[in-house]
Amino acid sequence: MQVTMKSSAVSGQRVGGARVATRSVRRAQLQVVAPSRKQMGRWRSIDAGVDASDDQQDITRGREMVDDLFQGGFGAGGTHNAVLSSQEYLSQSRASFNNIEDGFYISPAFLDKMTIHIAKNFMDLPKIKVPLILGIWGGKGQGKTFQCALAYKKLGIAPIVMSAGELESGNAGEPAKLIRTRYREASDIIKKGRMCSLFINDLDAGAGRMGDTTQYTVNNQMVNATLMNIADNPTNVQLPGVYKNEEIPRVPIVCTGNDFSTLYAPLIRDGRMEKYYWNPTREDRIGVCMGIFQEDNVQRREVENLVDTFPGQSIDFFGALRARVYDDMVRQWITDTGVDKIGQQLVNARQKVAMPKVSMDLNVLIKYGKSLVDEQENVKRVQLADAYLSGAELAGHGGSSLPEAYSR
């Protein structure tokens, strides 16, 4: 006959044998069992003295590995969030490129160069010194950064991103330390089994010398020296004041710029930096423009004519041209709404202002394209800064600075 005890009072007081059984079970639960090798290795990567992580980004690694009682909650009120600098790091440093939609053109030569560079840096090639840095340089507005973003997304890489503005600081040595920190953050991601890369935008603008008008600071010198040191020792990158003989995964570095001749010459030598001049061909320009006008029902033949009409313009010229076409519609909306009421419609309205698609035929695009070219020529011709009080010419060929299609 089996007796079921429903309460602890019955099991602990009324039945003596049950109390003894309960105590024996509790003693069995409190016995210390020697951990197996599998259990010891389970925590090996985050043990003190073994974990080489620079920050507290990874405090969530113990999630679902320990008892729920000792797990902090996630979310705004939780305590199991990476708090040190991880929110800024996730939102500013690491780019996911989830906002890039399919349909954009990637130059085959550009993708080939980036893919080979990243693959070579992750390979163990015998007795071959692979340059750690890939320097992509070329004219302004040619889509270097966007092509890099498309290539990264194609490769499934979420890189650690830095900009030229982070290469200068009021404190000496801060930018060099930041480069090392970001490099080690990317190395930590690779250590966990995911590809990563360090991506530096406009390196020449932050670390180069732009003539005699700019001052060469200690930080400029330290940035160049730090990149040289990392390129020579990519698996031994230490933070200032920390000297541990440890080996970290190698992180390929990709940087963009307009003129690498402004950089420190030993940095851009062939053993440290592989240089790639990005000059899009006619097919590249047509392919990129097809992505720009993909939602406007512009035919390929019209895009080819548009590119041939403005052969000397950069690729971002055509993006600005597409935005310029909406000027007439926005001007008409402002007229209908009233200048004094547009704030209520644009900021405080419950529904956003929706504009219908503008018909973009070749004639309209060429018309607005010529107006953009005229503005460029005005800047070159007037040069107001050189002769500000010397009777500079008015903008426009006819002496009018009024926008096109404006009527008094």
From Swiss-Prot:
Keywords: ATP-binding, Chloroplast, Nucleotide-binding, Plastid, Transit peptide. It holds the Pfam family AAA. One of its GO terms (cellular component) is chloroplast stroma. Activation of RuBisCO (ribulose-1,5-bisphosphate carboxylase/oxygenase; EC 4.1.1.39) involves the ATP-dependent carboxylation of the epsilon-amino group of lysine leading to a carbamate structure. Gene3D superfamilies: 1.10.8.1070, P-loop containing nucleotide triphosphate hydrolases. The lineage of its organism: Eukaryota, Viridiplantae, Chlorophyta, core chlorophytes, Chlorophyceae. It comes from the Eukaryota. It is found in: Plastid, Chloroplast stroma. This is Ribulose bisphosphate carboxylase/oxygenase activase, chloroplastic. The keyword Nucleus does not apply. SUPFAM superfamilies: P-loop containing nucleoside triphosphate hydrolases. The keyword ATP-binding applies.
